[in-house]
Amino acid sequence: MNLIMTILTITVALSLILATVSFWLPQMNPDAEKLSPYECGFDPLGSARLPFSLRFFLVAILFLLFDLEIALLLPLPWGDQLHNPTGTFFWATTVLILLTLGLIYEWTQGGLEWAE
């Protein structure tokens, strides 16, 4: 219990110190030079901020979601060595069903079609 209180005290103190120091640090003042893109000393030819495809962002988020799902289900073969493997497999199946329903919903809403 004493170790937990020590760690908790250090964590709270460090958080308060860092929050206080962040207010004292100089604020960033953006100007035209700081906001302009750097092109090896040449004047910029165009805008450095290109438009980002919202479809690409949606597909990337879906990829990360399903990649995380696979990473969470990788230790599942060792689930039969637990005291209650039925509960583990039940929750894994529930997660798979929910994510499959989400994928079907995205598919029917046209979220996976690339053409605009």
Curated annotation (Swiss-Prot):
Q: Which domain of life is it from?
A: Eukaryota
Q: Name one Pfam family in it.
A: Oxidored_q4
Location comes to: Mitochondrion membrane
Catalysis: reaction(s): a ubiquinone + NADH + 5 H(+)(in) = a ubiquinol + NAD(+) + 4 H(+)(out)
| Record keywords, A-Z | Electron transport, Membrane, Mitochondrion, NAD, Respiratory chain, Translocase, Transmembrane, Transmembrane helix, Transport, Ubiquinone
PANTHER family attached to this UniProt entry: NADH-UBIQUINONE OXIDOREDUCTASE CHAIN 3
Designated name of the protein:
NADH-ubiquinone oxidoreductase chain 3
Can you name the source organism? Cyprinus carpio (Common carp)
